[in-house]
């Protein structure tokens, strides 16, 4: 009879393997239920046959078995929404780019300037491939480049090659790859080849296909060189110490950014007078500032660079907008400089400095050495310290003999022109809704229509921090309306007419 009972039990549990641990599991489960706790002992793992069947349909639950059966997890993992996929890829890009510090990787130490001064500005700085080899990047360039290539392949797999957001992400990943390759070639002509690919060149044409950035540089050189600044109004003396400048900027940013903790600090390692980070601005220890300088820093570093970083950080899906790959540099730097113009805070000397850097990059591309460019800056009236700093900006990372500069400084003037054209065209074609998205984060112009279109489905959040003239576009609309007419008026003929009129003044 015992054998028949065992046989019947086998029939009732047809297909199941014997389990010697079941009584112990049942006892533990009953104890957990009595104590009001969740079951802590998992059911036995199904064998391969059971697992393969459960994918198609979960096995029926035996009412005599206190443990419910659990189907195996799908091989592909849980279902993910489009926004989840984008956010995960964006997070991966942000994390992958974190150790990349372009300006840190190509900086020169103070001894270089001292040696150049001792040589009476006649000997090339001793900065070459061996010099940069001693400065670690903080990552393996080949491995980091391969990581970004894998991210680009993941984007194609997850989003497809025709997805517009995917195209932005892919371009961003591949630009970071090329940035890493550029840094891996410091001190060689290959560095310049990547720099030109990433940041452009003064020889690049504007969208009209005819006018180059160099053409703009030569035109502005003639105009700005002839401006007599003594006739323009009051002079702004640089008498404000760095700590006082930082305190004033902290006060202004507290009013502008409110609860967002944007801080201004004094830094003794800066090469420039000021620089912006994601939520901070640093001013160089020992530098002195005028009230106009502080006005410019408020707009340039705060209203644009910090604000776009904060707007990007506020994104829950489009997280890549908080970081600025080279493809966004022209819009970022040009927008900051253009806001100086819109707020009437800039001045001819500063405009000349930006334009002269374009011409200096062009000269270096055409073979001028560090000493040649340094001497050119001296002929333009800069003091020797500023000559060195301007020339260093152009040759850092490249080849001091000439022919292979760092071309980033060409982005500022190009960005002024292209941002102005973007804003004017948006107003002319009744697409003013796109203009605020210049501030949604670190963007290129081709990104803006795509990002604006994805607000409704939650992929992108509109920008929170906008400069006053972009929160209320009425003034810019009138400005651009008249600007459109002025460009069609026939500039030379009008200028000649007034030149004859001015001649009457003697």
Annotate each predicted stretch with a short phrase.
Residues 350-506:
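Conserved alpha-helical "signature site"
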Residues 159-292:
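Contiguous, non-catalytic segments that form substrate-binding/exosite surfaces or channel walls
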Residues 290, 294-295, 299, 327-332, ...:
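Secondary-structure capping and boundary motifs in well-ordered enzyme cores
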Residues 274-280, 307-312, 386-392:
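Active-site-adjacent bridging/hinge elements
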Residues 295-312, 336-337:
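Active-site recognition of the HExxH zinc-binding catalytic motif
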Residues 2-214, 476-480, 485-506:
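N-terminal low-structure segments adjacent to metalloprotease catalytic domains
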């Amino acid at each position: 009879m015992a054998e028949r009972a065992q046989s019947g039990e086998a029939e009732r549990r047809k297909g199941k393997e014997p389990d010697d641990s079941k009584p112990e599991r049942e006892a533990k489960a009953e104890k957990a239920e009595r104590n009001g706790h969740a079951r802590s002992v998992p059911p036995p793992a199904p064998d391969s046959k059971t697992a393969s069947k459960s994918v198609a349909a979960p096995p029926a639950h035996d009412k005599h078995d206190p443990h419910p059966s659990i189907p195996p997890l799908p091989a592909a993992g849980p279902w993910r929404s489009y926004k989840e996929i984008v956010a995960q890829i964006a997070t991966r890009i942000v994390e992958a780019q974190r150790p990349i510090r372009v300006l840190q990787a190509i900086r020169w130490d103070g001894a270089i300037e001292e040696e150049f001064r001792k040589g009476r500005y006649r000997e090339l700085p001793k900065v070459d491939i061996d010099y940069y080899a001693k400065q670690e990047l903080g990552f393996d360039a080949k491995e980091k480049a391969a990581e970004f290539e894998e991210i680009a392949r993941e984007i194609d797999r997850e989003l497809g090659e025709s997805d517009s957001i995917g195209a932005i992400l892919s371009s961003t990943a591949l630009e970071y790859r090329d940035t890493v390759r550029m840094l891996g070639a410091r001190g060689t002509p290959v560095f310049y080849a990547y720099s030109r690919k990433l940041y452009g060149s003064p020889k690049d044409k504007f969208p009209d296909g005819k006018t180059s950035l160099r053409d703009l540089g030569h035109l502005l050189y003639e105009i700005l060189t002839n401006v007599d600044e003594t006739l323009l109004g009051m002079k702004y003396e640089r008498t404000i110490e760095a700590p006082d400048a930082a305190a004033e900027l902290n006060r202004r940013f507290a009013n502008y950014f409110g609860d967002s903790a944007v801080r201004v600090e004094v830094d003794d390692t800066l090469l420039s007078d000021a620089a912006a980070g994601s939520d901070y601005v640093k001013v160089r220890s020992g530098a002195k500032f005028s009230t106009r300088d502080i006005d410019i820093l408020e707009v340039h570093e705060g209203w644009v660079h910090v604000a776009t970083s904060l707007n990007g950080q506020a994104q829950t899906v489009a997280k890549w907008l908080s970081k600025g790959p080279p493809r966004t540099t022209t819009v970022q730097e040009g927008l900051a400089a253009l806001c100086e113009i819109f707020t009437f805070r800039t001045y001819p000397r500063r405009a000349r400095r930006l334009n002269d850097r374009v011409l200096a990059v062009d000269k270096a591309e055409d073979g001028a050495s560090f000493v040649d460019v340094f001497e050119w800056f001296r002929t333009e009236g800069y003091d020797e310290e500023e000559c060195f700093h301007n020339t260093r900006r152009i040759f850092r990372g490249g080849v001091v003999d000439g022919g292979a500069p760092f071309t980033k400084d060409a982005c500022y003037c190009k960005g002024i022109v292209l941002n102005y054209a973007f804003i004017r065209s948006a107003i002319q074609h009744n697409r003013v809704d796109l203009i605020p998205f210049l501030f949604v984060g670190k963007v290129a112009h081709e990104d803006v229509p795509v990002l604006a279109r994805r607000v409704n489905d939650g992929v992108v959040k509109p920008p929170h921090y906008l400069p006053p003239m972009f929160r209320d576009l009425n003034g810019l609309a009138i400005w651009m309306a008249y600007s459109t007419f002025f460009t069609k008026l026939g500039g030379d003929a009008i200028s000649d007419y007034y030149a004859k009129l001015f001649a009457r003044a003697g």
